[in-house]
Amino acid sequence: MIRTMMNGKIHRARVTESNLNYVGSITIDADILDAVDILPNEKVAIVNNNNGARFETYVIAGERGSGKICLNGAASRLVEVDDVVIIMTYVQLDERELVDHAPKVAVMNEKNEIIQMIHEKEGTIIK
């Protein structure tokens, strides 16, 4: 059996920019991407904590150390600058792979700096 599991998560990032006229996607600081094993062009699910919107797009790597979280194209209509978002990727695993799977979760502060990294096999508790 194949199961779809959360693989990488950026928890409580703040939207720094919104660009309607860009060709689509979300731009994320490359350092943040590396921390949670998200690749450029990878599909991400996004939840806006401020308005409840849920949507999908793909990733563009942003400047390292910038803290940039920029929604581009049509997705920019679903956020405002300073909204708090959760960005997630998923992976499909078989029963054997599930044994060793540990998602990477980066908990962010208001400046989009990583304040906690969580690597847990059994759910995550944010402290």
Curated annotation (Swiss-Prot):
PANTHER family reported for this sequence: ASPARTATE 1-DECARBOXYLASE
Subcellular location(s) of the protein: Cytoplasm
Active-site positions on this chain: S25, Y58
Cofactor binding, per record: Binds 1 pyruvoyl group covalently per subunit.
Post-translation changes: Is synthesized initially as an inactive proenzyme, which is activated by self-cleavage at a specific serine bond to produce a beta-subunit with a hydroxyl group at its C-terminus and an alpha-subunit with a pyruvoyl group at its N-terminus.
GO BP annotation list: alanine biosynthetic process; pantothenate biosynthetic process
GO molecular function: aspartate 1-decarboxylase activity
Predominant location category: cytoplasm
Gene3D superfamilies: 2.40.40.20
Cofactor needs: pyruvate
Pyruvic acid (Ser): residues carrying this PTM: S25
The protein's name in its UniProt record: Aspartate 1-decarboxylase
InterPro entries: Asp_de-COase-like_dom_sf, Asp_decarbox
One GO cellular component, as annotated: cytosol
Keyword Cytoplasm listed: yes
Origin superkingdom: Bacteria
Protein encoded by which gene: panD
